[in-house]
């Protein structure tokens, strides 16, 4: 089965095609440091056989977190704690990345004010953010760069830049949240400029042999007034030379009705993969091994991320291998349960 085939991106060889996507656990404290929960949470999925684990959205600045309970990577102390997590996860054969994020106008903590490309609140219950100056934009780009350097120091196999779900990069990309009239607003090319400059800065410090992933929301679900899959194709083509994989999600930049069903975002991965000729990760209420195999076998994505399913069942990969009589290496202490 394709699900159990290895997959190589640059120097990173994954033992299977299953990804644990970044999911905020809101389990840190105001320091942004990892704790015992994070160690158990991620290491358990590695023991369970997941090929690629992406650590949750991690703030590049204190007010770049989504909440005060999110992880941070704005200090050297954060890198030290993350380094221990990386070592533990790698012991069991998984590769590990970290998602670098700035929440922008969606920041709900107490370590500063929310900022955004334009002074427009997410909804009527949200704070109105401060519009970023050009100098402040440059400072955030440098913060992404510094965070990437710390991620390398911590030993991560890859990094993912968070450009989805209505956070700062997504806010620049979408015409629903970006009303600037300078070089960072207006046309698709201008709205992509911030993302491009972030990626260029990160490329300067991130090892060339290690992958850079980009997570995007390929559909705003606002009847064409926001980002559509076709515009996301254009955005990806602008930055394609700076990334190695596109992690394709959707929604989050503005309130919208989304019709949810198993695999509802897979079609977006398929569009990006085929139109941009880049490897993709598919995600979106995928919880069945046969669905995973269909996605991979029909070339709709190169990797498949299971969010809720891996929260429910950390041993999805092991139990699926047993179900399908696939011979894989089971963790020694657990062999009797699966052989």
Swiss-Prot record:
Name this protein carries in UniProt: NADPH dehydrogenase
Gene Ontology biological process: response to toxic substance
SUPFAM superfamilies: FMN-linked oxidoreductases
Organism listed in the record: Clostridium acetobutylicum (strain ATCC 824 / DSM 792 / JCM 1419 / IAM 19013 / LMG 5710 / NBRC 13948 / NRRL B-527 / VKM B-1787 / 2291 / W)
Reaction(s) catalysed by this chain's protein: A + NADPH + H(+) = AH2 + NADP(+)
Function (record text): Catalyzes the reduction of the double bond of an array of alpha,beta-unsaturated aldehydes and ketones. It also reduces the nitro group of nitroester and nitroaromatic compounds. It could have a role in detoxification processes.
Major enzyme class: oxidoreductase
Domain of life, per lineage: Bacteria
GO terms, molecular function: FMN binding; NADP binding; NADPH dehydrogenase activity
EC number: 1.6.99.1
UniProt keyword Flavoprotein, yes or no: yes
Pfam families assigned to the protein according to its UniProt record, in alphabetical order: Oxidored_FMN
Gene3D superfamilies in the cross-refs: Aldolase class I
